[in-house]
Amino acid sequence: MSLSVVISTKKIDKEFISILEKSSGVYKIEILPYENNGEHSLTEIYNMGLKDSTNEIVLFCHDDIKFDTKNWGRKLLNHFKKSDYGIIGVAGCRYLPTSAKWWELPPEMMGQVYHENEGKRWLSTYNRKFGSDILPAVLVDGLFFGINKNRIKESFDESIPGFHFYDLGFCVQNYLKGVKIGVISNIDITHLSMGQTNQEWEQNRINFSKRYKDSLPLLESIKFKELKFKKNKPLVSIIIPVYNYGKTLDTALTSVFDQTYQNLEIIIIDDGSTDPFTKLKLDNLDIPNTKIIRQKNGGPSNARNEGVKICSGEYILPLDSDDIMLPTYVEECVNTILRDKTISPVYCDTIHEGEMKGVEKRPEWSKERLIQGPFIVNCSMFSKEAFDSIGGFDESLKGWEDYDFWLRMMQKGYIGKRIAKPLFVYFHHEKEGTVSTIANQNMSELHKKILVKNKLIKDIPAYQPLKNNNSGFNIFT
């Protein structure tokens, strides 16, 4: 198996062609440079390349890139040889909205591309490296993409003029006919110029959106591997409430499937989402060991309670759809909670991301400290037995329901245990006005209300809320 490379360029650069030949690692590679100063659209040039190329595998790439990976051609050929993909690139996305702006939702973008411009070099990274795997996509960027001529269904759409949307047009028309499209991460490319969204780009976008209005949006879901269950290990139920945060759900789910402890069931509660993307995401989920429940909006406490009602796990771990766990978190929680039946919850230190950044060391658990104020992360493990003993989360509370939950667990004789490691990542969205953000603005009032509810304040008039400490994270000192 050999490789053909098609390039559209204003002036044929023999040095660039030599670099292609030497760096590819492919014997008798075929280079097809087409000199083009605007006489032809890119779709016309690329169709010429499809016709003129003698090899089954054809690479289309810009003439302003550097190949940072040795034997990149051999790697590309190997991807096609070991898979049934028809189109493969180094950057792309799983979601194409009706606007045709494929970068609208960064969590759905994939790949890594270096950029070099005006003496500066930087890496645009949309997800971490994933070895020699191929991640399914709905389209790939035209910077660098290979095709198998025997697997594609359509050539380039010559009704698209100029140099924009040739890649989207080619990918989408093939994707809609069942051609598999994917992104790889083991070939590094440096782009030596910046993309432009000029008037031609905008007109092509409008035309593209109109043409495919009945097909957009498009979404390709992540394929997760089966969890590997071990005998004589307790089952842990991961409860994930979702309300209009589908854009981060894949990241949260990836952190679940990356766990070293695999005896897991996943329960996703769609709490009445109204966001079109979230509904599309949930409609397209196909995940092993997972139950998806749709319900009217009832709030976080109701969603967690409904999840626990149908779970089979001996232990429960709530996870918000915009947060993630580090790979050993569940395993370390299970190892801790198995030491003593009275342990609930198990919690850890926290990595903060978003509008607040840093690592927060959580206090050690004690009754006195817990009464002072909340410090246990909402993504903490507890036993189903402990949950049942207190009747679950209080659905009447609008904020700090987890704090009330831990207090009632304490009053039933359960004790908390801290894992002194940052194994949980909490993302802040203060500007978006989430329930937790609004609750924290009224923390003194909520604190007092919850203590009164649980009969933990003896002298109400003497109650004084504690001030924030200097960490910027712990609410109470």
Model-based region annotation:
Residues M1-S4, P234-V236:
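Extreme N-terminal starter segment of soluble prokaryotic enzymes
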Residues V6-E44, M48-D52, L253-R294:
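Acidic donor-binding segment of Leloir-type glycosyltransferases
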Residues E39, K66, K70-V113, T328-V359:
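Conserved donor NDP-sugar-binding/catalytic core segment of glycosyltransferases
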Residues L76, V138-I147, R151, I160-I187, ...:
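A short, conserved alpha-helix in the catalytic core of glycosyltransferases
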Residues K120-G146, P363-M381:
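A recurrent flexible, glycine/aromatic-enriched loop bordering the glycosyltransferase active site
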Residues N198-F224, K421-P422, Y426-H429, V435-Y463:
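Catalytic core of nucleotide-sugar-dependent glycosyltransferases
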Residues K231-N442, N469-N470:
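Nucleotide-sugar donor-binding/catalytic module of glycosyltransferases
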Residues D323, V452-T477:
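Membrane-proximal basic amphipathic "stem/tether" segments
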